[in-house]
């Protein structure tokens, strides 16, 4: 089905992580008139965190959620990280025009988030992916790692290119 035809419910929930739940992977949703639930766990007044989480989780929806090959799930997680970075950056354009009081806080959030991961050049990112491939393939969501540094490092690198040519976002619809 086309993305515009999808019913998406966005809800706040009280857990330690946000999540996207597609109908195709959840039997309890079979009789519900919704295709995806997106659960966010940030506070209502934490705009930057809401933007970050929503961009990440909505990217899973755009990609049809998770790839069939579990070993490739790290790619979708890194693309979602890129989307979060991209949306945080363009949110400042919106805030400057409509809610200037949020610009400084959003920029501070973005800088703080980006500082938690490495900044690598082309050869550096290739070496990084090669050196971490085993971990990327077996633990794409970095479940036992605080802050998801592998996904953040790769997503941050990819975001630089997507920010230059936003047409690149069209490609993520084909990753499933």
Regions found by a protein language model. Give the residues of each.
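Sec-exported extracytoplasmic/periplasmic mature domains
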Residues: 5, 63, 84-93, 163
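Short acidic, glycine/Ser/Thr-rich loop/turn "cap" segments at secondary-structure junctions
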Residues: 61-70, 137-143
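Surface-exposed patches in mature extracellular/periplasmic domains of secreted proteins
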Residues: 8-17, 67-73, 91-102, 170-174
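Post-HExxH zinc-binding segment in Zn-dependent metallohydrolases
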Residues: 73-120
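Active-site recognition of the HExxH zinc-binding catalytic motif
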Residues: 51-68, 77, 81, 85
């Amino acid at each position: 089905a086309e993305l515009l035809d999808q019913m998406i419910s966005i809800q706040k929930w009280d857990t330690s992580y946000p999540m996207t739940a597609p109908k195709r992977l959840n039997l309890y949703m079979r009789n519900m008139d919704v295709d995806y639930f997106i659960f966010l766990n940030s506070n209502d007044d934490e705009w930057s965190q809401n933007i970050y989480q929503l961009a990440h989780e909505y990217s899973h929806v755009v990609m049809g959620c998770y790839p069939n090959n579990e070993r490739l799930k790290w790619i979708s997680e890194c693309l979602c990280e890129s989307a979060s970075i991209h949306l945080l950056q363009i949110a400042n354009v919106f805030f400057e025009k409509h809610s200037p009081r949020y610009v400084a806080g959003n920029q501070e959030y973005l800088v703080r988030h980006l500082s938690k991961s490495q900044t690598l050049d082309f050869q550096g990112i290739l070496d990084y992916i090669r050196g971490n491939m085993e971990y990327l393939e077996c633990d794409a969501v970095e479940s036992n790692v605080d802050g998801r540094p592998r996904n953040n490092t790769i997503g941050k690198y990819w975001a630089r290119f997507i920010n230059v040519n936003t047409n690149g976002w069209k490609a993520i619809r084909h990753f499933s």
